[in-house]
């Protein structure tokens, strides 16, 4: 089983079985998930600020409702104009690879592995006193080339997803305490 933690957690709360962030690239899937905009086949809408600024976003709605809005990604937040999109969507605090040590940034070809960012997020959430907040966490360990410090499954791709599942499971379990 690749995702025992997510499967377990799906039994504990609201679980959407037909909610998809359609795309074959992270930047396009992010816009799909946060703004409800179908991914374009040939270009990332994040690279089109005049268009992406006009899209609705969950973060804007939470901001209007008085929430603090944060985005965590262990990679380069400037890649594909992600930072511009996130700021235009009302995210107040962005945390990315440069907020971590060089050793942590070098833990994955794309940036900071999920075990490190999930531990960082856990510590941040435990210390928060400015709630309510809407925090978006974009994982990266399940990206190609699928190299992670974890060896539960023999095949590389399912193992990378299992690693992310392990990190998310630990994060949620710790937050429940």
Report residues per predicted region.
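Solvent-exposed soluble domains appended to multi-pass membrane proteins
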Residues: 1-177
């Amino acid at each position: 089983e690749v995702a025992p933690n997510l499967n377990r957690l799906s039994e504990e709360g609201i679980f959407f079985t037909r909610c998809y962030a359609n795309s074959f690239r992270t930047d396009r899937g992010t816009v799909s998930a946060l703004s409800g905009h179908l991914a374009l086949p040939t270009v990332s809408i994040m690279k089109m600020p005049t268009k992406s600024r006009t899209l609705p976003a969950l973060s804007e709605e939470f901001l209007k409702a008085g929430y603090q809005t944060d985005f965590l990604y262990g990679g380069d937040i400037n890649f594909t104009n992600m930072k511009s999109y996130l700021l235009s969507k009302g995210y107040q605090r962005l945390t990315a690879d440069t907020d971590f040590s060089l050793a942590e940034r070098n833990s994955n070809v794309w940036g900071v592995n999920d075990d490190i960012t999930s531990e960082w997020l856990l510590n941040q959430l435990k210390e928060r006193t400015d709630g309510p907040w809407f925090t978006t966490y974009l994982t990266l360990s399940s990206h190609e080339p699928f190299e992670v410090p974890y060896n539960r499954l023999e095949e590389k791709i399912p193992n990378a997803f299992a690693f992310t599942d392990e990190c998310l499971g630990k994060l949620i379990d710790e937050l429940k305490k």
